[in-house]
């Protein structure tokens, strides 16, 4: 992708230019084009690709109008700020100082292959954009502060990321089979969610994508939880913590989720005030109409300040943010099972396995790259034993490369240990006889230095810190298990049947 930048700047000085100051400025422009803007540019680069001041500088009393153009080297805005520093030194002898810089116009042109249906970002920085014959021109509205914040560079990278995402294979991740268990004994051909509803084990809750789980379903949840504790958490020495379930923007900004989480989160807003009189008419409206005055409530809330728990591990990281971990405390192994997670699934809701509110045991670990990989391998072995010998599932595992990992350059990062090829996610999938499809019901992710870097976590030895996580979703375990084994506990594997006991039928509806 070829990129060009063009910037028109207005430099305002403390006093009008004298003829001597004008001559000194012109000499400085010539020197900047020959030397200053070439610093750090690799040898052999075409000069047209390097930032330079073009056209004829215009002097208007205490104002200097300049045009900067560049390719990818010493980009136009970088050239501007290099020149600002240099001219301040040069014109000081003429008692001229820069007061401010206005950006008259800024244009970015990107030329290359754009995928069919490519959509230009809609952002307040972009006044106008045009994509014609493989050339995207963006007319920007930016201030000098925006340029110092590298807004043009970030816009270019954003466009490149959108192109990469569209050409990544037409889907969010790449999939490679690792293991398949082969067929196992099945006792069910029906949809387990429908069967649980018919038997009164679960009922739809008032909110979308939400279920009320009766005693029978919870017995199975707790049995799975016991298996996890006895076969995985305990033997691998994970310690329990409680992670927050209300997540502020700061956490998602550092974790990277702020790059794309918006269509899937439940947002959290706060009241503008707790003053009861401010809300009295809202309460009165309900008392009179029996309806909640939602439109008026929208006017009286602030935020959103963040969202409800989406991915369960990011809220852990402020606990170690900015810290240096002692060598002898590593690796750290923790888990959280304290509450629900929430994702807006839109039209993707199905059964208990794809819901907006779900229950998950989140397993998280961090340490050196080698320690992180070793724990992931131990988890893989534990899951394999549980799925094969205890749950007796028909399952398979696959290595996947989520788009966000490829996008952030995490795949193949070696960290000096030759283990970068292990970064990525392994999905575990169970066969669903009633649909003839596979359900992803478990995963293990090695995230490399993504989270430690985002939250500035270091190791005493100076070794790069890595982390991993694994979400154990109770709804998905239940959906996978019942789809194959059915709801009659007499057909269940011995360990599960023993831990569940006889399902409790507490309710009788007339």
Predicted ranges, named:
Residues 2-510:
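TRNA-recognition modules of translation machinery and tRNA-sensing kinases, especially anticodon-binding
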């Amino acid at each position: 992708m070829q990129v060009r930048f063009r910037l028109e700047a207005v430099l305002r000085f403390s006093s009008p230019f004298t003829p001597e100051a004008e001559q000194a400025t012109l000499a400085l422009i010539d020197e900047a084009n020959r030397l200053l803007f070439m610093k750090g540019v690799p040898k052999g680069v075409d000069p047209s690709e390097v930032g330079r001041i073009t056209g004829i500088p215009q002097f208007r009393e205490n104002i200097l109008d300049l045009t900067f153009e560049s390719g990818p080297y010493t980009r136009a805005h970088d050239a501007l700020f290099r020149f600002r520093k240099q001219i301040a030194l040069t014109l000081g002898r003429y008692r001229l100082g820069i007061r401010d810089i206005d950006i008259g116009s800024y244009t970015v042109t990107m030329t290359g292959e754009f995928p069919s249906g490519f959509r230009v970002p809609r952002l307040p920085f972009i006044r106008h954009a045009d994509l014609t014959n493989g050339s995207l021109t963006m007319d920007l509205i930016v201030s000098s502060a925006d340029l110092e914040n590298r807004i043009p560079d970030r816009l270019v990278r954003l466009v490149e990321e959108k192109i990469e995402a569209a050409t990544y294979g037409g889907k969010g991740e790449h999939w490679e089979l690792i293991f398949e268990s082969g067929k196992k004994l099945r006792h069910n051909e029906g949809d387990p969610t429908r069967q649980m509803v018919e038997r009164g084990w679960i009922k739809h809750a008032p909110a979308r994508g939400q279920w009320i789980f009766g005693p029978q379903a919870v017995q199975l949840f707790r049995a799975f939880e016991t298996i996890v504790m006895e076969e995985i958490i305990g033997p691998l020495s994970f310690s329990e913590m409680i992670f927050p379930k209300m997540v502020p923007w700061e956490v998602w900004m550092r974790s990277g989720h702020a790059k794309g989480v918006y269509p899937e989160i439940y947002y959290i807003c706060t009241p503008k005030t707790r003053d009861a009189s401010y809300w009295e008419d809202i309460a009165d409206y309900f008392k009179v109409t029996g309806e909640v005055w939602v439109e008026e409530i929208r006017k009286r809330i602030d935020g959103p300040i963040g969202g409800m728990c989406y991915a369960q591990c990011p809220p852990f990281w402020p606990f170690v943010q900015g810290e240096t971990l002692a060598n002898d405390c590593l690796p750290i192994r923790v888990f959280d099972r304290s509450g629900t997670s929430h994702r807006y699934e839109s039209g993707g809701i199905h059964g208990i396995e794809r819901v907006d509110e779900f229950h998950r045991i989140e397993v998280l670990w961090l340490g050196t790259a080698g320690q992180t990989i070793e724990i992931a391998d131990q988890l893989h072995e534990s899951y394999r034993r549980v799925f094969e010998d205890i749950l007796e599932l028909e399952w398979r595992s696959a290595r996947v490369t989520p788009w966000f990992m490829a996008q952030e350059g995490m795949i193949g990062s070696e960290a000096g240990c030759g283990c970068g090829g292990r970064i990525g996610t392994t999905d575990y999938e169970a066969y669903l006889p009633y649909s003839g499809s596979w359900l992803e019901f478990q995963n293990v992710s090695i995230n490399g230095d993504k989270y430690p870097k985002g939250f500035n976590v270091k190791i005493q030895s100076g070794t790069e810190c890595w982390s991993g996580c694994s979400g154990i979703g109770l709804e998905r375990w239940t959906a996978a298990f019942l789809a194959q084994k059915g709801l009659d506990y007499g057909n269940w594997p011995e360990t599960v049947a023993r831990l569940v006991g006889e399902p409790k039928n507490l309710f009788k509806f007339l």
